[in-house]
Amino acid sequence: MSNPNKPDLGHSLGIPRRTLLKGAASAGLSGVIGAPFINRLKAMEAHPLAGKKIDMNILGIAGWLPSSLGVKMSPLFDDYVKQRYGYDVSFGFAEAPFSDLFQKAATSLATKSQEYNIIISDSQWLGALAKPGWILKLNDIITKNKGLQLEWYSQTVIDTYMRYPDGSQDIWGLPQEGDTKSLYVRKDLVEDPKEQAAFQAKYNMKLPSTFEDYENLNATDYEKVMEFFTRPDKGLWGAAWQYSRVYDFCTCPLFSIMWSSGGQIWDAKTGQIEGVLNSDINTKAMELYKSWLKYMPPGATNYGIAEEIDVWTQGKVATCLQWAAVGLAMITPENKEKVMVVPPPKFGKAGAEKRIYCMGGQPWVINAFNDEAKMRVAVDFMNWWYLPETALEYSKRGGNPCDKATMGSAAFNGVNPWNRAYKYMLEPGTSQDFWHDPKYSEMLSLQQEGFTSYMTGQSKDAKGVLDYIACGQQQILYDAGTAKKEPSGVCGNVSL
């Protein structure tokens, strides 16, 4: 939905449309940022902000390295626009944890404030931010800026970080940080000849020890790996996965198991959830995921991102399902020679196993209430962000770009230890996002309550928990006009 109080960019800013939408990425720069940008810049171009100093603010995720990189790299952008366009810019960074960031952004945007000029949004928030007209629709911006007309690594990038509604051509975000689930593995354990011999003797199979081994690994055999390395008397467990009620921590691995096993979470076209989420396949996925707690350290039902980092870097687990974006925290100077990052296991019936894991990552979105100057800087910043030099520098600092040129380069796999797994999991059909619906927050809160109730033992019946979630989410979407059917009569009798 366009903002009725904000006409199409170019007219609303009072700047000639051709000037306003002229991209900052048409210089055709090459090389790496290590050599100063200014040595390769063309003569200064006419710009409506020439001679001015603009202060900008980015709102991002607290404690999340990729979020802060935009601001940490902003002096490079300042050099770029100072030499090319003749203006100065400085960036401040406001932040909030994942669980609080949406509310912080929404509270500000609802007042039409330009407190945060550019926001790093979680991907599922696109609908909630776009529908009220709080963020800028980017189709026209992209059309007029060749530097933003990138070839993305896969369709998954567009579907996850850019489009709302799903399946439409409306673009509201641009990828800031790409992210996929990866399995971090203790290379020092799986490459140990004594461990390999013991595993072979116990299970009559090779201990998976290479990227290719894990590429072909199914959940049944992965469970053997977890079991083998679960040695509480030695302070070692087989795995760490996320089970926490905070934000989406339990949801992401559980949805991944459901999808990979052949389950679905809703019908996006009709908004139908009851009868889809609460299926037998998804019930079995719930039961399997809970059963894996025996391979994890005590307290694993409270594990989120930070808790996994702690037990991993302390050497307490042999494997860990974690986001690729957390690579710099997971791989430290002390353990970097002992870690490999690989695709997580496949699920499903023998011979038909597959992996479809939850996407992570965040898009940039632009505040629709920015004044003319800040809107222009935001567009210039986006053009700069997707320059080849910037994307490569971002990767070198630990970020995950999403464009095909950067990710397809010969050097990319070797830049970070997780890059190969990240690319693998970004291939079509291997990862996907879940709802971009404006009711995302309410739906997530309800299911996190239900999922963790079962994982902690408060609720004993997996199918009953799924019925509770499905009925509640069906009501949420029916009340919002998204679902065509109201919850069935059965829903009147469900509870945790």
Where are these regions (language model features)?
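Long, aromatic- and glycine/proline-rich binding clefts that accommodate carbohydrate-like moieties
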Residues: 38-46, 50-53, 155, 161-164, ...
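Extracytoplasmic "Venus flytrap"/periplasmic binding protein-like
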Residues: 79, 83-156, 193, 311, ...
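Hinge/lid segment of periplasmic solute-binding proteins
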Residues: 46, 123-184, 250, 340-344, ...
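Extracytoplasmic/periplasmic substrate-recognition and gating elements
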Residues: 2, 54-60, 84-87, 165-169, ...
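Short, solvent-exposed loop/beta-turn-alpha elements that line the ligand-binding surface or hinge
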Residues: 49-51, 140-153, 197-202, 206-214, ...
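N-terminal secretory signal peptides
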Residues: 1-15, 42
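Glycine-centered hinge/linker elements that transmit conformational signals in sensory
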Residues: 221-230, 257, 261-302
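Short, polar/charged alpha-helical segment
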Residues: 64-88, 447
